[in-house]
Amino acid sequence: PRVGNAPPRVAEFKGGMLNSIGLANPGLERTKREKLPWIRDNICRPRVLVSIAGHTVAEFFTLVEGLDSEDGFLGFEINLSCPNDAERAGELFALDPSAVAEIISGCRIRTERPIVAKLAPNDPDLSRTVQVATEEGANALTLVNTLPRALLDISNDVPELGAGDGGISGPALQPSGLRAVREARSATHLPLFGVGGVMTATTAVEYARAGAALVQMGTASFAWPRAVTEAIAGLIQWGREHRVSAWDDLVSKPPAANASVNRLDLFDPIESSGEG
């Protein structure tokens, strides 16, 4: 289990919010004992990814081995890019191609379930990281995680978050997310999950046109609990107005050199269980 970072953990600003949750979670044994059985027993066809993160390379492998035989989930999202892990002092696995290769390949040999690698928005050589994750056996990529930044409370000159810095999410992250999806689309045939500022049907369409096979919504639900259902309704209306009958028709495909997108129909629809 992880207690996570000191409060306050969330701070709002005009462009979205900062969070510094610190990967707080119930831990492996409680997840096996309580969380996954509930999903198995209460959701008809669970399309859930378990998000895992380790302080060390070996911890990723321990989590995969500990969860792989359990029911109630589809696959793993390998969080290589959380900027709020105090024990790693902001050092991201996603910015080290050799670490990405070691973690993805090690997880791959330990499970036959789908593996989704979650990458960083501030990677100076994202195309290389994408290629490494692809070569080592990832089935899809999540782009992007939050972007490290800070907010200051000027009434007492201290950071607004208990941990000091945090990660940007919401509309302010959207340009970074779109850029990353576009870059990754040119570097791999894998399906891409677009993340960052998906607030409405319009932003979902933007991610699809950039190359995202699916999108994730998180911060939007903090602002408006019905954001997801309204976005779905908005997509249906958008499709009618623009004579588009299927989401796949919107998704920008990779260049011919990378062949067609490797379709994973198991991922439609899908939910991610875990904090960025």
Model-derived regions: residue spans:
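C-terminal helical cap(s) of enzyme catalytic domains, especially alpha/beta-barrels
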Residues: 4-14, 152-166, 208, 220-248
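Glycine-rich phosphate-binding active-site loops on the catalytic face of alpha/beta enzymes
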Residues: 75, 79-84, 140-150, 197-198, ...
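Glycine-rich beta-to-alpha transition loops that act as phosphate-gripper elements at the mouths
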Residues: 51-54, 119-124, 174, 190-202
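Catalytic cores of alpha/beta
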Residues: 58-70, 123-136, 185-188, 198-217
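Hydrophobic faces of well-ordered beta-strands that scaffold small-molecule active sites
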Residues: 48-52, 76-78, 115-117, 141-143, ...
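Glycine-rich, positively charged N-terminal anion/phosphate-binding segment
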Residues: 1-46
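Glycine/Thr-rich beta-alpha phosphate-binding loop at enzyme active sites
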Residues: 17, 83-98, 129-190
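Alpha-helix-loop-beta-strand connector modules within alpha/beta enzyme cores
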Residues: 26-45, 95-117, 161-192, 231-247
